[in-house]
Amino acid sequence: MISTSSILVLVVLLACFMAANAQWGYGGYGRGYGGYGGYGRGYGGYGGYGRGYGGYGRGMYGGYGRPYGGYGWGK
């Protein structure tokens, strides 16, 4: 299991990356189709504050969100 501190470090790095690349695309604040970690709802977001594969939102693979072992709302 990934430790909380590791997740926090990852989130900080993602936040820095997103702040430097805020745009409507890969990792932006909007809803880019393949955004790799934005604050929005990227269709294939790999981990951001939205609905990616592992972010604070409704991530699929181990974020703070719902399915697959998230810390938030269970499976």
UniProtKB/Swiss-Prot annotation:
Biological process per Gene Ontology, one example term: killing of cells of another organism
Domain of life per record: Eukaryota
What keywords are annotated for this sequence in UniProt? Amidation, Antibiotic, Antimicrobial, Cleavage on pair of basic residues, Fungicide, Neuropeptide, Repeat, Secreted, Signal
Q: Where is the signal peptide?
A: 1-22
**One Gene Ontology cellular component:** extracellular region
Q: Which GO terms describe its molecular function?
A: double-stranded DNA binding
Its main subcellular localisation, reduced to a broad class, is secreted
Q: In which tissues is it expressed?
A: Expressed in hypoderm.
**Residues that bear Tyrosine amide:** 29, 39, 49, 56, 64
Q: What induces it?
A: Strongly up-regulated upon D.coniospora infection.
PTM sites of type Tryptophan amide: 73
Compartment list: Secreted
Q: Which family does it belong to?
A: Belongs to the YARP (YGGW-amide related peptide) family.
Described function: Antimicrobial peptides that have antifungal activity against D.coniospora. Has weak antibacterial activity against Gram-positive bacteria M.luteus and Gram-negative E.coli.
Query: What is this protein's name?
Result: Neuropeptide-like protein 31
Underlying gene: nlp-31
